[in-house]
Regions:
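An interfacial alpha-helical scaffold signature
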Residues: 1-250
């Protein structure tokens, strides 16, 4: 791009694992490596040091890292990291952070991130709660046909009891899932603020040779829990949740 004035940085990999990616990057620019000793920054040209977080470019950022992961270990950076040129990338980041980056690449060698999200099926879990708790069943029946005004206290109690039961089941089932999956992982990061009806949101750092076993465990869980839960399972991914790498000079 003739108007390009800056370099967008996706992540860092070993120089001998870096591969060009034609037209794969943000703004459909080609991804090229900027080497420094054993390291390489994965970059593409951009017009400005500010890159808006548009959906297509967020996807391209993830896809570039995913392709790089096929060829070797990669340390991902968050979306939007831009350097003025290859010289500043080396002098302000790769050189001063060299020892740290090498250490991180060695730490994450042969490891990938797998993302698991589990959600209750709303109708199924509510039916389960009603069936398991006679008081909730009676309250539900008592408030079903009556007016809101006349049964207001009962409705409040019903809501509180259902919420408490759902919370108890969420915590219990979350631990069951974690116990089954974490034994296959090197490390786990659990989302601290799950959304409604979410049982688990977690990222697992897994050795590549154990990914197949993790896949099998996920398939078994999905089959066992199919009547009451559904899952979203992504990976292998670059280890975003575990690297925590910023682009500030060190």
């Amino acid at each position: 791009m003739s108007a390009a004035t800056a370099l967008y940085l996706y992540g860092v990999t070993w120089a001998d694992a870096a591969r060009p990616q034609a037209g794969a990057g943000v703004h459909e620019e080609s991804v090229e490596a900027v080497p420094y000793r054993e390291l390489a920054g994965l970059t593409s040209a951009v017009e400005s040091t500010k890159v808006p977080a548009k959906r297509r470019d967020l996807l391209r950022h993830a896809e570039v890292l995913g392709t790089a992961l096929v060829h070797g270990t990669v340390l991902p950076l968050r979306f939007g990291v831009v350097f003025e040129n290859s010289t500043t990338l080396v002098e302000d980041f790769l050189l001063p952070r060299y020892a740290e980056l090498v250490q991180l690449l060695r730490k994450f060698e042969g490891r990938v991130e797998l993302s698991v999200k589990a959600y209750f099926r709303e109708e199924a879990i509510l039916a389960e709660v009603v069936h398991a708790n006679p008081r909730i069943a009676r309250l539900r029946e008592a408030t079903r046909a009556a007016s809101d005004t006349s049964t207001y206290p009962l409705r409040v109690e019903l809501g509180e009891r259902v919420a408490a039961e759902l919370q108890e089941r969420t915590l219990r089932d979350r631990q069951v899932l974690l116990d089954r999956l974490s034994r296959l992982a090197v490390d786990v990061q659990v989302d601290q603020e799950p959304i409604e009806h979410q049982v688990l949101g977690a990222s697992f750092l897994v050795d590549r040779e154990r990914v197949a076993a993790f896949d099998d465990a996920m398939n078994k869980l999905a089959q066992e829990q199919a009547p009451r839960m559904h899952f979203k399972y992504l990976g292998p991914l670059a280890p975003h949740s575990f690297v925590g790498l910023s682009a500030e000079a060190g």
